[in-house]
């Protein structure tokens, strides 16, 4: 499966499995894969550059906010990210500068059905939820009504024609 291939490649590239990393042997049927956390991940590894859509998470330690912004923006995807910090001002600087659809601070995947959800770059077009999603179905039309009915010289000329 795609998950098995991604995990195997990450191991070959030098990422270290902290937990998981294999299919569960507790289920005879199905494709249940153990939640997997990787450490010692570098920015050029596929496990961090490609969307996994599986219970696999790479952990990459960074030294500065600038490094995090540059690394995040270097990928072709932009669905969501989470930052854990006590410095909300720095977190908001990251939110302003990272090209991402959903930016979570101190909590992954906080869901709010009134808030727009969707990615940037190759992680999707458009938004679900919120007024932004409704805008996808709206077609604007301008309607102007002149209740005055008087001649407008600027439009009809001096004779009202």
Predicted regions and their residues:
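Short alpha-helical functional segments enriched in proximate histidine and acidic residues
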Residues: 6-9, 13, 71, 75
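Conserved C-terminal structural/oligomerization subdomain of aldehyde/semialdehyde dehydrogenase
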Residues: 23-25, 32-161
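Short secondary-structure junctions
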Residues: 12-23
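Conserved strand-to-helix beginnings and helix N-cap segments that scaffold or border functional pockets
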Residues: 1-4, 31
């Amino acid at each position: 499966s795609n998950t098995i291939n991604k995990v195997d490649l990450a191991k070959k590239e030098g990422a270290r499995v902290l937990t998981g990393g294999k299919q569960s042997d507790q289920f005879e049927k199905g494709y249940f894969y153990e939640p997997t956390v990787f450490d010692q991940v570098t920015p050029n590894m596929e496990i961090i550059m490609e969307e996994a859509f599986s219970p696999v998470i790479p952990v990459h330690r960074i030294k500065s906010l600038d490094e995090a912004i540059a690394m995040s923006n270097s990928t072709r995807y932009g669905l969501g990210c989470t930052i854990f910090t006590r410095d909300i001002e720095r977190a908001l600087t990251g939110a302003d500068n990272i090209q991402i659809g959903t930016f979570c601070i101190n909590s992954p995947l906080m869901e709010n059905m009134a808030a727009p959800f969707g990615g940037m770059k190759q992680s999707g077009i458009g938004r679900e939820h919120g007024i932004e999603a409704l805008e996808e179905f709206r077609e604007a039309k301008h309607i102007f009504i002149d209740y005055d009915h008087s001649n407008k010289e600027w439009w009809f000329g001096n004779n009202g024609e």
